């Protein structure tokens, strides 16, 4: 286990913005994880657990220790009705989904090509095309940071919500996700109700056909972070009450939204697109020309470029629709997590 000092974070997050961390260490086991958190030299320093860095924006140099989760490995077991997959927290999520499909195991195919590690999936409750992590989760294994005990949380204990979980609230900064357990029924049912997935002929429906269609759509709509720095969907789809929705529907008949319990989930990409932001650039940051929900590092951008562009978008959407956009991407300052509203106050 090598502890690096004053290291560039550019290779460790998909926005690929030049920013540095005072310390960085890659951990390959729970014991190494404990060693870092128990180290008296680091005890008073802020720490950040990082997986693939696919959902973060470093707004300033990080003054503490970035701990990169490299815990790897997966096991498969089964009974008459289910497949059970245990995946270590550092396992690459897209590779895990593809591996399952290749094994003939269905249930994860709608979540194909979502960048990140298995350990990040429950924190965000990742989701796409009608499926969320909570739908396939059996348990989440965590390391408590106060006494270094290990606990197994049931899906119910994780308190999953829309891009939300207990790890953003009661357990925020209290634990590290070291593994996840997935439970996938052997009696597979296609989830093809979303958009392009409906194009698959009924006789061709299979985990593999949905997997390929999801990959095709994502590659067509979303830029590859290896080619253009980005963190995927920058904003959450806002949830509004039905009264607000009906007012907007009367004024904007083509508004795109879906039921979310007693409320409505509005397509943030549509809102941003209708405010004419596709292709708009601030400094080196740009709204992707094909997908308004994605902000990119188009030309050696700075974090401030992204912040300014995101602020312009939020203001425009609020002025036109009275909807407050919330960023899905995590903002990391010099000592830990922050948010766009705080940064705007500071500036």
Swiss-Prot record:
FAD-binding PCMH-type domain: residues covered: 16-187
GO CC list: cytosol
Localisation per UniProt entry: Cytoplasm
InterPro entries noted in UniProt: FAD-bd_PCMH, FAD-bd_PCMH-like_sf, FAD-bd_PCMH_sub1, FAD-bd_PCMH_sub2, MurB, MurB_C, MurB_C_sf, Oxid_FAD_bind_N
Main EC class the enzyme belongs to: oxidoreductase
Enzyme nomenclature, EC number: 1.3.1.98
Reaction equation(s) it catalyzes: UDP-N-acetyl-alpha-D-muramate + NADP(+) = UDP-N-acetyl-3-O-(1-carboxyvinyl)-alpha-D-glucosamine + NADPH + H(+)
Cofactor: FAD
Pathway(s) this gene product operates in, as recorded in its UniProt entry: Cell wall biogenesis; peptidoglycan biosynthesis
Pfam families: FAD_binding_4, MurB_C
One Gene Ontology MF term: UDP-N-acetylmuramate dehydrogenase activity
Keyword Cytoplasm: yes
Any one Gene Ontology BP term: regulation of cell shape
Keywords: Cell cycle, Cell division, Cell shape, Cell wall biogenesis/degradation, Cytoplasm, FAD, Flavoprotein, NADP, Oxidoreductase, Peptidoglycan synthesis
Active site: 163, 233 (proton donor), 328
Similarity comment text for this entry: Belongs to the MurB family.
Protein function: Cell wall formation.
Protein name: UDP-N-acetylenolpyruvoylglucosamine reductase
Organism the protein comes from: Vibrio vulnificus (strain CMCP6)
Protein encoded by which gene: murB
